Regions:
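A generic local structural motif
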Residues: 43-45, 101-103, 126-127, 162-163
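Active-site cofactor/substrate anionic-group-binding motifs, chiefly glycine-
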Residues: 47-93
Length: 171
């Protein structure tokens, strides 16, 4: 995917405007008499070999362009300052261009809890290369058929996806 396409994705996300908010679908029911003490509530989650204080992280956003690098650096700074996990966007562009620095956030944020992701269409050896290059806590494998179908340059061959997922799960 070209740098222009990555920037186009950013532009679409920024231009998207909607009055819909999924939080509007949540109805909080007032309970005057609580059944538990606040100290009894524990949001700790065990995931990826770690205990997380609460299940909140910055999920895969972008990568693969100069603008994406700026966004990733800002998100990484916030995540590091707050002790939250940051997941980079799909490393596909980084695999194509060894000079792409948009994913290289650890050098400026050494205490960052980092993960990255890769598309299921990528061979598992490319996933291993991604891990070797970025040293994330884990590799997230994304499956996004609709995105592939909507992008003119998107993947059109899906017969390997199931085997790839099985290999990623064993690796």
């Amino acid at each position: 995917m070209s740098e222009n396409r990555k920037d186009q994705h950013i532009r679409y996300a920024l231009e998207q405007s909607s009055s819909y908010n999924s939080f509007d679908e949540i109805e909080l029911i007032h309970r005057s008499l609580p059944l538990v003490d606040l100290a009894e509530i524990d949001l700790t989650t065990h995931f990826a070999g770690r205990d997380w204080e609460f299940p909140f992280y910055i999920n895969a956003m972008t990568g693969g362009s100069k603008r994406a690098k700026e966004i990733n650096q800002k998100l990484a700074a916030v995540a590091e300052a707050c002790g939250r996990l940051f997941v980079t966007g799909s490393y596909s562009a980084g695999l194509k261009d060894p000079n792409d620095q948009s994913y290289a956030v650890k050098k400026d944020h050494p205490h960052l809890l980092l993960a990255t992701n890769i598309g299921i269409d990528k061979e598992p050896d490319l996933g291993l290369r991604t891990v070797e290059e970025l040293h994330p806590l884990f590799l997230q494998v994304h499956v996004n058929l609709m995105q592939e179908l909507l992008m003119p340059e998107g993947e059109r061959s899906f017969h390997t996806w199931k085997d790839h997922l099985k290999s990623y799960g064993q690796g």
